[in-house]
Amino acid sequence: MRFSLSTTGLQDWNGDVLVVGLLQDQPATDLEARFPGLGAALAQQQFKGKPSEQLLINRLGNNGPQRLVVLGLGPANAFNLDGVRSAAARAAKAASGHTGSLGLQLSWDGLEPTAAAAAAAEAARLALYADQRFRKAPEPRRQPEALELIGLPATAAAGLQTVDATCAGVELARELVAAPPNVVTPAALAETAAELARNHGLELTVLERADCEARGMGAFLCVSQGSDLDPKLIHLIYRPDGEVKRRVALVGKGLTFDSGGYNLKVGAAQIDMMKFDMGGSAAVLGAMRSIAERKPAGVEVHMIVASCENMINGSAVHPGDIVTAADGTTIEINNTDAEGRLTLADALLYASEQKPDAVVDLATLTGACVIALGDEMAGLWSNNDGLATALQQAADAGGEGLWRMPLRASYKEGLKSKLADFKNTGPRPGGSITAALFLEHFVGDGIAWAHIDIAGTVWSDKGRGLDPAGATGYGVRTLANWICNPE
């Protein structure tokens, strides 16, 4: 899909599908002037401009668009960038079946034009995403080839420049999360990183099992013991032209399948969906795709993924085993289904060795976070208020729900082991907090760190807004915004 600002106004636009948004109780004066009789049609349908309302009219004559769609936008005082995204996603879906141009006019007043243009274009493209890779005969899809935004000033065009890069990263993350575990393996994630390196001039190092053993990564490696697939620690680097003013590390959980190990997932644990336990790695790989295309100046980005499967065989780690992380910390495993934090422990230690100013990890880590925040908000824990604020702003700008959670030090008592330095899980209450506290231990001194738990947001069963049902690609927009727009 191509994106542009329309050079004509509503009265003169003559593309294929025209979508116009009306605020609640807003008179349809401009529409009535262009399409006489439309006001009566809206009145007949008792159209009030509520967010759920939509009126579609086909065949408006020889001189008009083939389809007109009027969307309700809700109250004026509640219409914001999230409203733009929702309306643009609805507009794109309403234009399905037409391969020409889609014109979109919303209520842009009070919105920053550049941000509004970016929000609308990203939502329109992402809402039409469909994954048909695994079908014998993919269904033909007719979609608009171009989106023209009507009524925005010329300065808004700057917001369209990064849309393709952002959406490409989100779509890569969606593809990785949605693919089955016999397709997306640790080796496949490493190959995805290799392809990014080849296509975008990035640097890649992949540590094999022997390399990880030499580094003493016992926490990571113990998780992989039950699998026939070799683990991979993937290190992808973006280096900017010119001076490096800051260095950051993105760490993603990369469990390509999680059976739970001997603490086998049963019942509501949805073992059949545990292909998405590598959602953190998908997010950071997708972010690297976007970052590599946008080429931010002055920032060096290290992406680290410790990838493996958590399976069961005669060599699998037992409940009660004690393992040693790369820094010598000993961990008593009281739950083999709390494996993600073990892989992240060694990944965070490795990330800290790169001497970053900040480390951000993303992981489908705890069901407790889903209970607390649902499936539209990810949880954020951080040891640094400035970093937490920057990530919150980046998430807000990208339309991704993020909520800061407490990092209460006293809860760390629940991780104490009688035999080792730590247990890998604490008591049930506050489980997402103790998980974050466990990770914090493995971050180097003086490094700003944040942990984002995406267990609820990585997948949408029914779809919502610009996210179709399935993998959402959550986290890519937040990370890309944080790194590329540091101000």
From Swiss-Prot:
Cofactor note: Binds 2 manganese ions per subunit.
Catalysed reactions listed for this entry: Release of an N-terminal amino acid, Xaa-|-Yaa-, in which Xaa is preferably Leu, but may be other amino acids including Pro although not Arg or Lys, and Yaa may be Pro. Amino acid amides and methyl esters are also readily hydrolyzed, but rates on arylamides are exceedingly low; Release of an N-terminal amino acid, preferentially leucine, but not glutamic or aspartic acids
Gene Ontology process terms (BP): proteolysis
InterPro entries (UniProt xref): Leucine_aapep/pepB, Macro_dom-like, Peptidase_M17_C, Peptidase_M17_leu_NH2_pept, Peptidase_M17_N
Keyword Hydrolase included in the entry's annotation: yes
Binding site for Mn(2+) 1: 258, 337, 339
Keywords: Aminopeptidase, Cytoplasm, Hydrolase, Manganese, Metal-binding, Protease
Family: Belongs to the peptidase M17 family.
Protein known as: Probable cytosol aminopeptidase
